[in-house]
Amino acid sequence: MASACLPQLFQAVEIDGVSYWDGGFVGNPALYPLFQVETTRDIVIVQINPIERKGTPRTAPDILARVNEITFNASLMNELRAIEFVGRLIDQDRLPEGRYRKMLVHNVSETQPLAPLGIGVDLNTDLGFFEQLFAVGRGAADRWLAGHYDALGERSTVDLAAMFRAIPTPDDSKPLR
């Protein structure tokens, strides 16, 4: 499976003469095709890589692992920013809803039980570890559904505008260092 072929660990997988590697480096997976689906406006994201972490990685392996997390999240963050932008334009009556749709975004994530595992856990291939991850994911999904099921089809459970306000951006009035 190409989705498990991290380029720094495994060779590309060849299928019908075409080489593939993990798509997280480009789009993991792309959200834009979901705009074409007319039966729902909901996008439920199962967040695996944290957007941010407490502390600063200090060792070379920890820094590389964090770079991978940031890389894997980059395309997702760009698409979420575009979804927020289109939604804001629709709310301001600057884009006609119909041709454009306001998407309802939801995020299932469980970072607390995984935090003690540290960064770089994506390289662990132990069966027991996968069973632990499965249990954590099942619990996260159950809790999310219990708390947010009624929001599906009605409203977003992620405040994208607040998410992007919280991300520091360069201050153009200050010189770069």
Summary of predicted features, one role per range:
Residues 1-177:
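Patatin-like phospholipase
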